[in-house]
Design a protein with these regions (language model features):
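Active-site-proximal beta-alpha core segment in soluble small-molecule metabolic enzymes
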Residues: 10, 34-113
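A short, N-terminal amphipathic alpha-helix
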Residues: 21-31, 48, 69
Length: 113
């Protein structure tokens, strides 16, 4: 094994473990017919998106930057949820996401108009 740098923090991803987890996720999908989305807030290592996209159906994004990341690097379905959608940024949100979650009646009104 190659020596790992110890002078700075880093993430070490184990492809075998990711693949094993994806196999379990596929079993759940096959047994239930459900759709499984990845929350970019929890895991946004776009370098492994091609591997994840073989099993996962898409992503959820809670910021415009996450929505853009999903659109650019993760094929499939994209869902957005945010405490606040700004009128200025919302047209860009619609370029990146197919559906949106509203967190208040005011957001429902905003999203419908």
């Amino acid at each position: 094994m190659t020596a790992l740098p110890n002078d700075r923090p880093f993430y070490l991803l184990n492809e075998d473990k990711i693949t094993a987890n994806l196999a379990r996720i596929q079993q759940v999908k096959d047994a239930t017919g459900c759709t499984i989305l990845m929350a970019l807030k929890a895991f946004s290592h776009y370098q492994v998106f091609p591997l994840l996209a073989q099993t996962l159906d898409g992503c959820t994004a809670s910021s415009l930057h996450e929505a853009r990341l999903a659109h650019e690097y993760f094929p499939g379905y994209h869902h957005a949820y945010s405490p606040a959608y700004s009128p200025r940024d919302f047209p860009e949100w619609t370029d990146y996401s197919q559906t949106f979650t509203a967190n208040s009646l005011q957001q429902v009104d905003f999203l419908q108009n």
